[in-house]
UniProtKB/Swiss-Prot annotation:
GO terms for biological process: mRNA processing; RNA splicing. The lineage of its organism: Eukaryota, Fungi, Dikarya, Ascomycota, Saccharomycotina. Belongs to the CCM1 family. This is Mitochondrial 15S rRNA processing factor CCM1. It is found in: Mitochondrion. Residues 56-65 have a biased composition (Basic and acidic residues). The keyword Repeat applies. PPR repeats lie at residues 289-323, 324-355, 362-396, 397-432, 433-467. Regulates mitochondrial small subunit maturation by controlling 15S rRNA 5'-end processing. Localizes to the 5' precursor of the 15S rRNA in a position that is subsequently occupied by mS47 in the mature yeast mtSSU. Uses structure and sequence-specific RNA recognition, binding to a single-stranded region of the precursor and specifically recognizing bases -6 to -1. The exchange of Ccm1 for mS47 is coupled to the irreversible removal of precursor rRNA that is accompanied by conformational changes of the mitoribosomal proteins uS5m and mS26. Residues 1-18 form a transit peptide. Disulfide bonds: none annotated. Involved in mitochondrial-nuclear incompatibility, a major determinant in reproductive isolation between species, through hybrid incompatibility of Ccm1 and its interacting partner 15S rRNA between yeast species.
Amino acid sequence: MLRYARTVRFSQVGNSVRTSSGSFGPIRTIFISSHDRKSPSHSLSPISNLPNHNDSSTERARKTLDDDFQRKIKYDELKTRKRIEDLRALTKKVSQLVKQKQELSKIAKIPVPSDEIKKLKSVEDVVKVTKSQHVATVRTNIPEPETVTTHIEKEESEFVMEQNAFIVPATPIPEEIAKRLGLALRYLVSETNQNWTLVLDQLKADRGFKDLPYTTVVDFLTKIPASELQKVIPKVDQLLKEAKIPKTAKILNLYIASLASGSAVPNQVIQILENYCKRIRKLKKGKLPKRTCEVMVQAYGKNGNINRIQDLLSEMKLHKIEISGMALTNILATCVYKARDHKQAVEIFDTMRFQKEVYKPGTRAYQDIIVSYVNNDDIEKAIDIYREMITEKIEPNQQIMVALARGCASREAFKFKSWDFIFEINRNNWTPTLPTYEYMLYLSSRDGDLALTRALYSRLLKDNTVSLRSFNFLLLAYSKARLSDDLGEPFLINADEKGRKFRFNVIDRSGISDPTNQFPFLPFNELTTKEQIMAESSAIWAHACLNNSELINSESTTSYLNIASERGTLSDFIDRMEGSTFLDEKINNVLSGVVIEEPDVVVETTDFLTQKSSAHEKYDETSIVKSPILKSIQSKRTPRVSLTYVVALKAAGKFNNYNFANRIWQERGKFRKTETFKKLPRTEKDKLDFQFATQMVRTLTELNLLEDALAVLKSTEYQFRWTWKELDVLKSAAIRQGNTNVAQTVRSIARRAQLTYEGKIRRKDYKRYVMQRGY
């Protein structure tokens, strides 16, 4: 049959298809037969109504229809089988629940030891009453003595004290000791309520460890939890001494493990552990067992003593004792959390990673090294380690996600990934812990999202889980809050749809706008003015002083002052500084022999040092940004620290008040002479001085005193490691004002610092290097 090609254009209008000679619609090539060409108006009929002839296309269509019919039948069959399997599984589950309920009902009918004891006591009372009545020959309805005796024998046959005194034991105790304990086992009612002191007292009353095999005694000691064993070590020693059982290395190892089981091990406990180790060395011919070494590594780690860990590792190497992966993990945790030695932590982790056959790092090791990288502001490497975990198919945990979120928030390039890691916790169906909620507060407060921070904090209030960390993050949110008139990027959490929904739901369900809320939140979901921020932060501070004074310390006070520096006025800042801090007057009276007399200067009324330090007299009755309660709580004040003066200098620069700045750095000089500052390590003193000097340079620059800022810089050039991070503000201001002398001097100081501290090569040294190499 002849076939030919015909090209037409189609456009669809409604449900009909028509050809068009216009320019719209795709070009399609349709092959039609001569039969179709002769009858162009013939409508397409269903496949079932096709003419029955030997056309191949018709056969293929019928075959396709049959295949589709068979496919639907198979699909329905599979669907039916799936339903049958679900019904079977449901039936099985129901039967298991019924069976479990029957077993629980049987267990509920089992008498507990106290019930049996009550029955026994009631029988004894009946015996006493019967005997007395028998002597008096008074006839009553009480059974005869013979009947009572028979009843007693029956009760004793049904109730055997040794078998039923502790029906469901919390700890499987050796049988020989269980017989001696008797009713004392009832003090071990559950895993969470154990009184081993009374158990040992009862055991001592019944021969103690006498005539018991050594293995039985050791087995009994291993059943005592480590946290409980450290409390009863003196009693155990006495029982061992009375039974003349020597304290072997195995028993001493139990002592060591129990004393090292706490979250921190003080120096006094370390001394006791080292004495135990000396006794073990005598028993083992000068060599510590591997188990003892591993426990001591853990103990030194909790004590933060890296040097003793290194000595112990050298001893293990000398005696050819191979260190285990668990010991390396403990050392890694010590370097990260106690010693904060990032370089050593990286070396240990690399050792574990490149010797996977022996020290394969697990989830805990990856968690510790990721936290170390985040703490050292290397989020790129932390993300690389996380990707390595995924490649090695090592299961991450919630702490890793929180650490990565915290690290991403501190970097401009990664800040949009911070909430993604938080939402990963929800994808893995993990229950958020308190640190997770706290760092959600941190992310929102750092981003200036005050509404979300207040909503999350209200959730912690409902759960009664407010901590010092979460309180500080709330205060941080007030100082960084974005107001309605602040222009900038949208909140990070609004970067995707999931974040927007999460933020809306948390704020909507917080209940902050409820006027009956007991916490002093203003009844608005969002604060829109600086006055609202100042008023609410003041009310929250007063509430903490009255009801939760443990939240008040130097760190939270500094955050409280920073709110006034960012959102208030200079008078607000001075009022808060006077009302919440004081200068510790414990100053060393032995000063230098030279006394410089300052000339009398006229200062403004805002100078808080020339006025009487009294929050009551400074209180403004008409102020709407101060809580009235603060008028009567003058005692809730903390000593000023170095960071207090840094924040005060920042406020002086922002409000352009030189006199206030001058008095601040004079008082900071007095603060350096206090006992609190003198007791600090040298490195900490240098760190705080550099922090204050950096703020001095910034404040003087904001006051347009560029020469004074340069003088501070030149006087401390060789004392501190200045970088462009601290010097860029002064250099930029000098360039804007056209002060080339200051700009050039700042560049010279930065260049010399790079040569001295950063290892930058000099130009002439580079030329000499090229001449010697010849290229």
